Amino acid sequence: MGKFQLITKGLIKENPTFVLLLGMCPTLATTTSAINGMSMGLATTFVLILSNIVISAIATYIPDKVRIPSYIVVIATFVTLLQFIMQAYVPDIYETLGLFIPLIVVNCIVLGRAEAFANKNSVGDSALDGIGIGLGFTCSLTVLGLVREILGSGSAFGFKFIQGDGILAFVLAPGAFLALGYLIVIFRKLTSKKAE
């Protein structure tokens, strides 16, 4: 697989949200706005890239029996680092995302890429895989957050452009399921036409 394909596969072919349906907890819970979705996606991307690099570099030294716990320790280290950085530089976003930042440790996207890709490939390829999957996750969370924000409150990225109240359901959990379902259908329809 070429270097460019390692990055682009996460955007379309192996999109974590719309194709693989991974990471649904943060996807549904943090996408009440485009900014929240983008922030969660970027936070996950940061951890994904760095953990892929380290896991790929040390994969040959990790015994099979402690492989998964070792991955969790590596991922938890980067999540802790991320928490410190976010608390220092973007405290408002850190407060908004709250509990979902520490939950990146057990996010199946990050663990899945460590197990399925990083431990079997080179450091460079693992970094590119992390970038691609992370960008795909970030884009899908941002789009979902944007749709929910527009329909739920009549704003985009915090800028109100529709007067009056939006559709309350889209700000709440049921709206997350509805918006995600429709976006999955649209994404799959568009990608199936592209494949033909």
What positions do the PLM features span?
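Loop-to-helix transition at the N-terminal end of transmembrane alpha-helices
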Residues: 35-52, 56-73
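C-terminal ends of transmembrane helices
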Residues: 51-64, 111-121, 186-188
